[in-house]
Structure formats: C-alpha cells, structure tokens
C-alpha cells in the first residue's frame, strides 16, 4: 500500500488513505524521553503499543466512549478517523508519581484522595507547559464547555480503565489523553492509550510502562508484552 505521509511524530507516522476522513497510523519502534531529546530504537515496541492501544480503544468504543479508533490493520498499523487535535495534553493522576511527586514534594506511590486532572499546552517549542482553564480560554484552545466535557470524559475513562486494569493485577497510576474534532465537529478521544502515555504498576510495585526505559529498570518490551498478555486474556 502506497500512502502519502501526513505527519511523522516521535512514536507514530500518519498517512493518508483513499478516504479523506480516515488516516492510517503506523507505530514506530522509537522510544523517547525528555520531550524527544533522547531517542532509541527498541525492536517490537511499536507493534506492542499498536496492539495495546487498539485493544483499549476498542473496549472504550464498546462502552460508549467516542474515539477516533476504527480498526487494527496489522501488528503495527491501525485505521483512525481524521481528527483536528486540540493542542492540549490532559493528564489524570490516581497516584503520586513522576513530575507530580517532584513538583509538590509528595512521596511517589501515595494514593490521591481523588483523581486529579492537569492540563498541558502541547507545544514542543515551549516544552509543553502546565496550564489552567483560564490559560486555555486566553489561548483560545477550547471553550469552557469543551473543557468541561473533556474533563468529564477523562474521569469516565479513568473509572472504567482503572477497574479493568485492576482486574488483571495492574494499578493505573496516571495517563495522558488527547482530544480532537472529527468531520462532524464532534469532540472525541484521539491519539493512543499505551504504556508510552500511562503509568502502570503491578501488584509487586514493578513498573510496566515507559518508566522502565526512563529509569533503566530492565526490558521495556518484556514489560509491554506482559501488559498485552494480561489484557488479551481478559478480553477473550
């Protein structure tokens, strides 16, 4: 299949298809940290992320969450609706970890009384700064109603996935979401949901996400394979 490249990102390439409203997503083996400043190629990582994200998005579609996901094509490719992405990273935290622990001096691993949502302006040149609702309004990134909907959907997604992951012995520590508008102007969930953009800990406290790479804790693909195997077993 010969498709024109639309966009090449850190972890995925996006290609046109014969349908203007559908894009082909190809997952890469590249893994990055420090907002892309450090990069490595890890064989099999793209395939694992594609399969995990496809499985999770299919689940979300089935429980009524509107997403861009259409279907998985191969181990590394999937079809998605074409979406105009809002330049916001929506982070939900269930447990203190990573930058949250550093910013607020909270011990990593402390469960939060209630899930906390944070917003980041998706802008590589500015290093994706932490912003609030007023900043979003000033920058005209989204309306108050759209932000309210995004937060509502993020909490709904969290409630479902937290329980689902817990059923296979994984704690959903935190995750990042992105939203955008489809051709009808409907605000839907986009991007991916994989161990690249969430934190997962097993019942022994072992990291099962990209922190394995960031902190040099062992085999990244082995951790991702474990996540995929557990989710697949539950989905059968």
Curated annotation (Swiss-Prot):
Catalyzed reactions: 5-amino-1-(5-phospho-D-ribosyl)imidazole-4-carboxylate + L-aspartate + ATP = (2S)-2-[5-amino-1-(5-phospho-beta-D-ribosyl)imidazole-4-carboxamido]succinate + ADP + phosphate + 2 H(+)
GO BP terms in the entry: 'de novo' IMP biosynthetic process; cobalamin biosynthetic process
Top-level class of the enzyme under EC nomenclature: ligase
EC number(s) on file: 6.3.2.6
UniProt-listed SUPFAM superfamilies: SAICAR synthase-like
Gene3D superfamilies in alphabetical order: ATP-grasp fold, B domain, Phosphorylase Kinase, domain 1
Annotated keywords: ATP-binding, Ligase, Nucleotide-binding, Purine biosynthesis
PROSITE patterns: SAICAR_SYNTHETASE_1, SAICAR_SYNTHETASE_2
Matches recorded under Pfam families: SAICAR_synt
GO molecular function term, any single one: ATP binding
Origin superkingdom: Bacteria
Coiled coil: none
Pathway: Purine metabolism; IMP biosynthesis via de novo pathway; 5-amino-1-(5-phospho-D-ribosyl)imidazole-4-carboxamide from 5-amino-1-(5-phospho-D-ribosyl)imidazole-4-carboxylate: step 1/2
NCBIfam families, A to Z: purC (TIGR00081)
Family note: Belongs to the SAICAR synthetase family.
Record-given protein name: Phosphoribosylaminoimidazole-succinocarboxamide synthase
Gene assigned in the entry: purC
